[in-house]
Amino acid sequence: MAVDKREFVNVFDYEAAAREILPKFAHDYYRSGANDEITLHENHNAYERIKLKPRVLRDISKRDLTTTILGQTVSMPILVAPTAFHCMAHPEGEVATARAAGTAGTIMMLSTLSTSSIEDVMSEATGLVWFQLYVYKDREATLSLVQRAESAGCSAIALTVDAQIWGRRERDIKNHFRLPEGLSIKNLMPAGREQFPKEQADSGLAAYVTWQFDPTLSWKDVEWLCSKAKVPVLLKGVLHPEDARLAIDHGAAGVIVSNHGARQLDTVPATIEALPEIVEAVDGKIEVLIDGGIRRGTDIVKALALGAKAVGVGRPIIWGLAVDGEQGAKRILDILRKDFDLAMRLCGCTSVEEIK
């Protein structure tokens, strides 16, 4: 399908085009949330209920969008959140996404469930890459992933803590979701964990998680990982302030306020609603990031004003990738950067620090 990308002015335009381009099963996988998808809609709608109060008569002719996260400098407080199976959206998959993030001067978080290997992605990456980690029942396999990520040059580990078991994603169940022929979880090859189980009643990914992921994951494992990792470890999937405090106690360098794109437990709070309590709980001791529902520059300003160090963007990157590969993913980051810059100026701010 030919699309005139010159008419695309926001991430929603890319989303609409991707819906027409992607096979239904792939679009449903990327777009869907858990159960009734209440939290899926709330993740963005909650931003609309927060109002900005701008300052006026300030010199906004020069701006600085750069910031530091875990001591790492990025061009803007907008990161690529981890999402699985990029090669379903475009043949170059995660490699194209990494190049786009590098060109934009920001961080890509590479998923464990990547359809490109850590080594292939890092050989093409021109910027910072963090590795998102799921904990497998086989701890040696888990540790091997961490060591490979570190050896390849990943500068942080984002441990997902809200997905020891899989949420009920009804679109995937109806589609009997599985990876298309020729695609696999490249980071687990050739260990026999790179494909979904052959026998499955509904979602192949849900069956894979039950087969491989460790439901006994606990705070002891966080301590274990922090003791083994040579790079900072963040916990991704924190919504409760007490868990944020425990993250500090167990050695985490940061938390990512996330509800897994509303794909795990439906009716949990929108991430922006959970953010203020978590920022208060950590009291500046570790860094706080957020993802979920961010589609506009004003959303980014609101998240930073409420205490987030940076935001992660997931689905929009996939829409850009599906429409135009590396250039589409880069265009999504450009759109968000410009929209954030404009919103920041209209609020009377000239730097990320001023927003806070």
What is each model feature region?
Residues 1-48, 273-290, 294-356:
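Alpha/beta catalytic cores of nucleotide-metabolism and tRNA/nucleoside-modifying enzymes
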Residues 1-71, 169, 176-217, 353-355:
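An N-cap/entry alpha-helix motif that binds or orients negatively charged groups
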Residues 33, 111, 132, 159, ...:
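Active-site-adjacent beta-strand anchor residues
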Residues 34-35, 112-116, 137, 239, ...:
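Short beta->alpha linker loops
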Residues 51, 66-68, 77-81, 107-111, ...:
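Short, conserved beta-strand segments within well-ordered enzyme catalytic domains
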Residues 74-118:
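Glycine-rich active-site/cofactor-binding loop and its immediate structural neighborhood
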Residues 85, 99, 103, 120-124, ...:
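Alpha/beta enzyme core
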Residues 127:
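Conserved thiamine diphosphate
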